[in-house]
C-alpha cells in the first residue's frame, strides 16, 4: 500500500527495531505484536498502546487483512473453499480440510502462477504478483476465525509456485512457526513445488524441517515437457538429484505428486519407468486423479488403472497412495473459483 510498512510481515525483532528507531520504548513492540496475532486489524483497537504511537503506526504502517469474497462448503465432507481478497483487491484461493488428526489448510503463495502447467486452472488466469508473508498468514487467520477452529497443518499447494516467491515464503514459514506467532510447527508444514531445482538446494540448506512435495507428474522428460514447461529448463534427472540432496541434508523424505491423466501418463509402462526412476530414493508417491479443467481435454484415470499403477510401484518397493478427494462438489482444486471470479469481472 503505497509507501506504508507491511507491519504484519515483520518478525518481532524487526518490529522492535522499527519501534525503537522511531523513538518508542522497546517493550511496545511486543505489545503491538501480540495484538497482531490476536487478529486485531485496526491500530485504534490496540488498547494498551498510547495515542502518539497509534498515530505513528497509522501514518507509517498498515495491517494486511484477508477478506472473504466467496465461501463454499462441501455438503459431503465439510471441506471449505475460500476466495480471499487483499488490500489491493487481488484475490487468491484457500481450502480448509477436516481430517481425524485435525484441520489442514491449503494456502496460496502467489496471485496466479507463471509456471503454465497444462492441467492446472491457476495458470490459465495469468500471473499478477507474489504474496507477502502477511497475506499468507492472513489466509490461515481468517479461516480459523471464520470457522472457529485451530489449524494444525499447512500445505503450500494453492495458487502459485512457492519457490518462485522464495524469500517471502521462507519468512512466512518462520513467522507461522514462531512461538510468538501462530506456533504451527515446521513438521506440520508441506511445501509443494513444480521443481525449481536451484531453489530446492537453497531450501535444503535452511534445515527448516518442512516436508517437500514435488510435482513430478511424469516418468520421463518427454511427457513432463509436454505438460510442465519448467521441465524444459530442468530435467527429471536434475530434479531427482536435488530431491536426493534435500533428503540427505534434512533427513526429511520427499513426496512426489503424480497427477494421473488418462492416456497421457498412466500406462503400465509409465508405472514401470517411474518405479525405475525412484528406486532407492526412500520417497513416497501420491497419485492424484487429475481434476477436470475446461479447455484441457484431460480426463482422470479410472479406479482400476489407478490400482494397477499402485501395484506396479509396490512390486518395486515404491510406496504409493491415491490422494483422497475432498470437496468434489465445490471444485476444491486450485484456481477454479478464482477463474470464475475473473469471468464475473473480479480481479
Q: What feature does the model see in each segment?
A:
Residues 1-92, 244-253, 258-347:
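Auxiliary Fe-S-binding modules of radical SAM enzymes
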Residues 31, 110, 136-139, 306:
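Glutamine-centric residue-chemistry signal
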Amino acid at each position: 500500500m503505497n509507501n506504508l510498512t507491511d507491519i504484519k510481515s515483520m518478525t518481532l525483532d524487526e518490529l522492535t527495531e522499527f519501534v525503537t528507531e522511531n523513538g518508542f520504548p522497546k517493550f511496545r513492540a511486543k505489545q503491538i505484536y501480540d495484538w497482531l496475532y490476536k487478529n486485531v486489524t485496526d491500530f485504534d483497537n490496540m488498547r494498551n498502546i498510547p495515542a502518539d504511537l497509534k498515530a505513528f503506526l497509522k501514518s507509517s504502517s498498515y495491517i494486511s487483512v484477508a477478506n472473504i469474497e466467496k465461501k463454499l462448503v462441501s455438503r459431503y465432507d465439510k471441506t471449505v473453499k475460500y476466495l480471499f481478497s487483499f488490500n489491493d483487491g487481488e484475490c487468491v484461493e484457500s481450502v480448509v480440510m477436516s481430517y481425524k488428526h485435525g484441520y489442514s489448510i491449503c494456502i496460496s503463495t502467489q496471485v496466479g502462477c507463471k509456471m503454465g502447467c497444462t492441467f492446472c486452472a491457476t495458470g490459465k488466469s495469468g500471473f499478477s504478483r507474489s504474496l507477502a508473508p502477511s497475506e499468507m498468514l492472513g489466509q490461515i487467520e481468517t479461516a480459523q476465525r471464520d470457522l472457529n477452529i485451530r489449524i494444525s497443518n499447512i500445505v503450500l499447494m494453492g495458487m502459485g509456485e512457492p519457490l518462485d516467491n522464495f524469500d517471502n515464503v521462507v519468512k512466512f514459514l518462520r513467522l507461522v512457526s514462531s512461538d510468538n506467532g501462530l506456533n504451527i510447527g515446521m513438521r506440520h508444514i508441506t511445501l509443494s513445488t513444480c521443481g525449481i531445482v536451484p531453489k530446492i538446494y537453497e531450501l535444503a540448506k535452511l534445515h527448516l524441517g518442512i516436508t517437500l512435495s514435488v510435482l513430478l507428474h511424469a516418468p520421463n522428460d518427454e511427457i513432463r515437457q509436454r505438460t510442465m514447461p519448467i521441465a524444459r529448463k530442468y530435467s527429471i534427472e536434475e530434479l531427482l538429484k536435488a530431491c536426493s540432496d534435500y533428503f540427505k541434508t534434512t533427513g526429511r523424505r520427499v513426496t512426489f505428486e503424480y497427477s494421473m491423466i488418462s492416456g497421457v501418463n498412466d500406462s503400465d509402462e509409465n508405472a514401470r519407468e517411474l518405479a525405475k526412476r525412484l528406486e532407492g530414493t526412500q520417497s513416497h508417491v501420491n497419485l492424484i486423479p487429475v481434476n477436470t479443467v475446461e479447455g484441457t481435454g484431460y480426463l482422470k484415470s479410472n479406479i482400476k488403472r489407478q490400482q494397477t499403477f499402485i501395484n506396479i510401484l509396490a512390486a518395486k518397493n515404491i510406496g504409493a497412495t491415491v490422494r483422497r478427494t475432498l470437496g468434489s462438489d465445490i471444485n476444491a482444486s486450485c484456481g477454479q473459483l478464482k477463474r470464475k471470479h475473473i469471468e464475473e469481472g473480479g480481479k
